[in-house]
Amino acid sequence: MIRRRVTVHGSVQGVGFRFSVARAAQSRGVAGWVSNRPDGTVEAVFEGEPGAVDSLVRFSREGPRGAVVDRVEVVEEEPEGLRSFGIR
């Protein structure tokens, strides 16, 4: 089990980014959350098996159609045992 905190910069709000990340996380069995931030970024936490989390990080680098991702920051964190995925 691993945990990653991801901050996505670019035109990523108002394009369904959070919803597409949530669907992708649920289909991969990854727990965590995704949220729009006041500065225009999207922040997410992913917890799960390494391959599934890495797949979500890759997905975040592209996002849904309509999103323009300029930069993605990824920080390793200690897992907290999250059990579900939510949109904040």
Stretch-by-stretch model annotation:
Residues M1-R88:
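Intrinsically disordered, low-complexity, mixed-charge
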